[in-house]
Amino acid sequence: MSLRLLAVACLLYPGAAAAAPVHVWTEARDFVARLFSPAESCELGEKVVGGRVEPGAQTVVVPVKKRAWEASLGGEEAARPYIRARLAGWPARLLADRDALPRTDTEFVARLARDSWRGLEAFIDREHQLPVDNVRLGVASAGGDEARVGDYTNVTSIGLRLIAIVAARELGLVDEQDAVGRVRGLLDTLGRLETYDGFFFNWYDTTSLERTSNFISFVDSSWLTAGLMVVRSAFPELHDECTRLIERSDYRFFYDADRQRMSHGYWVHLAARSHYHYGVLYAESRLGSLIAIGKGDVPEEHWFRMVRTFPPACRWQSLPPQARARKTVRGHALVGGWYEWKGERYVPSWGGSMFEALMPTLVLDEARYAPRSLGANDAAHVAVQRRYALEELGYPVWGLSPSSTPANDAYGEYGVRVLGSLGYGAGAVTPHAVALALGVAPAEAAAELRQLAARYDVYGEYGFYDAVDPRSGQVAHAYLALDQAMTFIAAANYLTDGSIRRRFAADPIAARALAVIGEERFVD
């Protein structure tokens, strides 16, 4: 199935995603995001109706060495046990003893951090130290034939792996020598991966190290840079090696100087940037914009050219924008505005998911450095996430964000519709969304994590599984590298008074960028 066909099928019939491997579905999902990516003018309807397609999204890169290796073992299915054997560990049981879980917030989050770290350590390729993208267990046992390993990895997952190693050191789960050794092993593998113009490709096979994508992603590249920044702040002996990798990545590569926005990425086989741009400010991509500004690769004007709210004429919006007026911040003209829902005022994200809203807060203390803009917005998004789930959806729990789908072996984009410009639909609740809220509403989030574990069979040997249907109680018995790493890093920040955020802020790139975000006020 082509990515274009899969993307269209998933728009019309979400169950179609179950027919594709996770990494193919993720590429298709990214394609859909590009298809719907807006400019400040109301282009969304034109792009959908006109059927404009990102040409590069239809290509597939076949890992030739990997296919030959599988063939030598009797084919893809026959190779599965060998792939599993490459992992550093495997859970012995499907579920943890619910009655043995701690009953106080701090003790529970500490247990979650320990268990999640054990999972992050287990689900890496032992030879190459790369995290595998996902591990999906069966519904009856942890070790059954139903289990599947997605032995490919994404640049964001590598960046978060670096941050997670630092977090494990901060928590005392590994000593400094072990942590440095783990980072060195990962950096050695990075040195063996194919790159282009200083950047890594978006996907690699963890068994053969072949790239499996033609795309170089702006936002994913920025998370690798963030990981390197945290590492060089934590471990002076690795400073020079991390700095070399950081400095060779010039983010002008993604910058459209005419629009003053970052492209979604670059298609190497087409020698062309993506047609689409990150136009919405309040999205996970904002961290990459700040890194690019802090490095001096793009001007700070870029920050003020991203959309806070779309014009009222954009009828497809989930809510009409309020108080949309021109203003000046740090000498830059911009148009502000906000949405309002049941007394809560906020700048929307694109889909209304917790991932878009709070992933940057893993490394960036927005409440401290941008209290009247990003910090206040983070708090509003958590409040609406909670209230919308409980009051509008009738869920007993909250936390909506892209995650596995409990009903089938697929992936869905979930969010709170009124929190997004377009807004994703509601669906499964995912623990990583609640964990991200630990840095914004710690008491509420910690209590909710305990509630999830007490109410549903969603806590395994390596911490929370990826998602639960709050209506049926059905669980997606999957561990996703991205979601598990976000959960662990958020828990580590909670337990160490934001140590990862402090490491990031201490880096000179971050220090230069922080001045850009301090003056703006989202809601007057």
Residue ranges and their predicted role:
Residues 61-524:
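Ser/Thr/Asn(+Pro)-rich, low-complexity disordered segments
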Residues 17-19:
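Boundary at the C-terminal end of the N-terminal hydrophobic targeting segment
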